[in-house]
């Protein structure tokens, strides 16, 4: 059976002189009927509109579509090598079985491909599951800014429900989605999910939208401390990641 095609988006962010964030590219893993795999990289409209963005090394032409039979070095370098002794722990933190490693794009999207040396973030394009529902796994962001969050997280268990709360008055991002446990602030959903979650909260029956603890990684850095799972309905006509900055610049890439 041919594996399904996979898509992750690439976002760029900056904090100075003011916070800004945009999707700037997409990376697809495409399979032929024979199971042959190729990777396709292309820039999106966000790369042309967000101030300060520079093209990735080796892929400087915003209008070009880049293809390769192996993962591009700029993304391969964002994955921990399998030869490293901590690789098994890295897979476990991300919710994968170390004895059955996932496809590289699945791991890249789950781990977000974050490096301290740049402002790039990688995340998966949400797709409906086999039941036609929205299911997404993500790490809680912003834990370090909440004074009691780390201690509160240490008492959570898989399956615990979290409260999802909009923050329209948030001065940084009016689309921010906060996460709480028994009234205690833990952090936020990733920014790349916030607008879609807003729509799901508006269009899905309240009982179908749930965020639960998938696992707590007490020995992990804060950015990988709390892995959550979100379940929701998939409304008719719902298209995640459909704002202008997600649209491909090249006409050779399907929208």
Where do the language-model regions lie?
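Conserved active-site motif detector
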Residues: 1-255
């Amino acid at each position: 059976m041919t594996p399904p095609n996979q898509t992750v988006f690439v976002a760029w962010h900056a904090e100075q002189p003011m916070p800004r964030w945009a999707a700037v590219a997409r990376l697809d893993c495409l399979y032929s009927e024979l199971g042959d795999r190729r990777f396709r990289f292309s820039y999106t409209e966000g790369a042309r509109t967000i101030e300060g963005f520079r093209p990735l090394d080796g892929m400087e032409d915003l209008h070009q579509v880049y293809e390769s039979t192996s993962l591009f070095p700029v993304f391969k370098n964002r994955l921990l090598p399998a030869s490293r002794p901590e690789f098994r722990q890295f897979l476990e933190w991300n919710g994968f079985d170390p004895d059955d490693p996932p496809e590289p794009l699945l791991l890249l999207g789950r781990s977000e491909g974050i490096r301290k040396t740049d402002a790039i973030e990688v995340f998966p394009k949400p797709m409906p599951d086999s039941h036609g529902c929205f299911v997404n796994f993500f790490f809680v962001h912003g834990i370090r800014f909440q004074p009691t969050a780390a201690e509160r997280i240490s008492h959570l268990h898989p399956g615990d429900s979290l409260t999802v709360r909009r923050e329209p008055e948030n001065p940084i991002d009016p689309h921010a989605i906060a996460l709480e446990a028994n009234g205690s602030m833990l952090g936020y959903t990733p920014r790349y999910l916030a607008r879609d979650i807003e729509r799901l909260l508006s269009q899905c029956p309240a009982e179908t939208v749930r965020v639960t603890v998938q696992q707590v990684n007490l020995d992990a850095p804060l950015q990988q401390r709390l892995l959550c799972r979100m379940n929701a309905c998939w409304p008719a006509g719902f298209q995640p990641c459909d704002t202008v900055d997600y649209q491909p610049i090249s006409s050779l890439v399907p929208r």
